[in-house]
């Protein structure tokens, strides 16, 4: 006959982080980001379809705005648990470079390819955000400052919001309520203003 399990025991099992054999800071959240990445990719695809074919239907764009913070969260988790940040940055940087011409062709006026070459796609923003957070984690302040200055000064998608969100996710990794409050205070007002 099965034994009765108390609610507090079930809650404890569900909310206690699994033991991870790696050293470094621990997150009190689910580290399997594969499902989150799929959700972010689907949201991004819906956003791009809406932007290209149904620009007057705002719901496509709103759904798409879920993608960026999810990608920032996944990059923060990756930063904390990757074995080689340089390889991680290299892969992201290569993907940013390869996708740049397609980004310009898809989202900027035809015939102005060269004029829009410095409208950097979202992967450059994510690359610089990851680079900045790596600088913060390793106490290389100049690297953090350089990344923050670069995304804030030049024409990057989401500008400094990438570093801002990754900073919130990194610093509040074991304080989810504080992280959620800071996220709402920092990211959602930008969305309400039509970002």
Give residue spans per PLM region.
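Alpha-helical transmembrane segments and their immediate juxtamembrane cytosolic regions
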Residues: 4-195
């Amino acid at each position: 006959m099965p034994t009765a399990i108390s609610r507090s025991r079930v809650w404890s099992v569900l909310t206690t982080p699994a033991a991870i054999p790696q050293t470094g800071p621990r997150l009190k959240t689910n580290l399997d980001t594969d499902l989150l990445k799929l959700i972010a990719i689907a949201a991004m695809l819906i956003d791009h379809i809406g932007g290209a074919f149904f620009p007057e239907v705002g719901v496509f764009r709103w759904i798409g705005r879920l993608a960026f913070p999810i990608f920032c969260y996944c990059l923060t988790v990756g930063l904390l648990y990757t074995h080689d940040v340089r390889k991680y940055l290299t892969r992201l940087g290569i993907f940013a470079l390869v996708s740049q011409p397609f980004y310009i062709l898809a989202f900027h006026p035809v015939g102005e390819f060269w004029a829009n070459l410095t409208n950097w796609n979202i992967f450059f923003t994510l690359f610089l955000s990851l680079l900045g957070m790596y600088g913060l984690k390793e106490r290389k302040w100049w690297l953090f400052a350089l990344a923050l200055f670069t995304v804030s000064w030049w024409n990057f998608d989401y500008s400094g919001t990438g570093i801002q969100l990754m900073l919130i996710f990194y610093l509040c990794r074991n304080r989810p309520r504080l992280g959620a409050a800071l996220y709402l205070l920092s990211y959602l007002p930008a969305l309400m203003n039509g970002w």
